[in-house]
């Protein structure tokens, strides 16, 4: 299962991966906001409050993880863009040197 999963990940573009991670981060932030709203507005027992705080801690950790993933993906996307620009410049140089 791990092998097929890595093969599938290799076929996904960096931009679509960024979109997917941003969507997951947004879902976590929305869940976190709902949990914070529930904590403020409802009278919760100690057990419910602790469970809600644990859930909020987990959601905060996920948001931080997604932010780190986004930072890595954006760096990879930037590197790919620079590589594309360099290849375009080299192609243009060869075209104007040998053909034009």
Curated annotation (Swiss-Prot):
The chain crosses the membrane at residues 82-99. InterPro entries: CCDC-167. One of its GO terms (cellular component) is membrane. The keyword Coiled coil applies. It is found in: Membrane. Pfam families: CCDC-167. Its main location: membrane. It is a single-pass membrane protein. Residues 14-81 form a coiled coil. This is Coiled-coil domain-containing protein 167. It comes from Danio rerio. The lineage of its organism: Eukaryota, Metazoa, Chordata, Craniata, Vertebrata. The gene is ccdc167.
């Amino acid at each position: 299962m791990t092998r097929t999963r890595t093969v599938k990940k290799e076929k996904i573009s960096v931009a679509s991966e960024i979109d997917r991670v941003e969507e997951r981060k947004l879902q976590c932030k929305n869940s976190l906001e709902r949990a914070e709203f529930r904590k403020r507005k409802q009278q919760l027992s100690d057990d419910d409050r602790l469970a809600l705080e644990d859930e909020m801690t987990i959601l905060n950790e996920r948001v931080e993880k997604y932010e780190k993933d986004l930072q890595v993906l954006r760096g990879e996307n930037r590197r790919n863009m620079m590589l594309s620009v360099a290849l375009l410049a080299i192609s243009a140089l060869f075209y104007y040197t040998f053909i034009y």
